[in-house]
Amino acid sequence: MAIKIENKSTIKLPRKTEETIQSVFDVVPKEHTRGLSKVVLVDRVIPDTRIQMPSNISELPGIYHPKMGNAQPFCEIALGTLLSADGWLKRIAARLNFRPNLAYLALSLQAQHYHLTLSHGIKKNQYEGAIRTYIDRYHKIWREQQAGWRAKLFKPIQPLLDKWVRKLKKRYAAEQKRK
C-alpha cells in the first residue's frame, strides 16, 4: 500500500517530488511503515499544540507527528527549508541537492516512526544512534537503486576508496591525539 502524499505547499515543487518520496518508502520494508498514514508537504513546519516543542521549530525541515488519540501518525515535510530562496547560488544548490535531501529527510521521519512505535527494546538515550544507522542503511540502498552511469562506473573500486577513507581517518585521529 502506497503512503498518501498531501501537498499543502504554495511553493512550486521540483518535478518528480512525489515519485521520489514513494521510491524512498518502496526501499523500506512494508512492516516498518505500518500505521504511518500520510506525508504532508508544507511551506513551513507549524508548531503542534499537542506536543511541547522549542521556539525555533519553523526552521525544521520536517517533523514526525506520533499517534495521539484518534489521529494517525503522519510526517510533515517543510519545502521552504529544503528549497532555499535566499540568493541565486543558494537556490541553484538547493535545487541540485533537493532529491537526496528529500530522500534523507523522508527516511529520517520514517525511521522515527519505526523506532518510536514498532521497534521495542531500545532505551530513550539510544534512539538517535539507532535512527541514524537505520537511515544510513536504507539511504545507501536507495542511492544504489537511483544510481546512474557514474555510480556503476565507480562500483568496482568502491572497496578501495572505503579502505583509503578509513586509513585517512585513522591518520587524522592519530594527528589530533598528538596535538
Model-found features: residue ranges?
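Short loop/turn segments at strand-loop or loop-helix junctions that form parts
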Residues: E76-S84, H115
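Long, well-structured alpha-helical subdomains associated
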Residues: R15, I141-K179
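Short active-site segment of divalent metal-dependent hydrolases/proteases
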Residues: L107-H115
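An active-site-proximal "capping" alpha-helix that borders the catalytic cofactor pocket
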Residues: N125-I141
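Hydrophobic, Leu/Ile/Phe/Ala-enriched alpha-helical segments that form helix-helix packing faces
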Residues: V24-H32, Q110, I135-H139
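A metal-dependent hydrolase signature that marks the N-terminal structural subdomain at the beginning
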Residues: M1-E76, L89-A93, Q176-K179
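Short conserved catalytic/interaction loops centered on acidic-Pro-aromatic/His motifs
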Residues: L116-G129, Q146-W149
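Short pre-active-site segment immediately N-terminal to the catalytic Zn-binding motif
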Residues: L83-A106, S119-K123
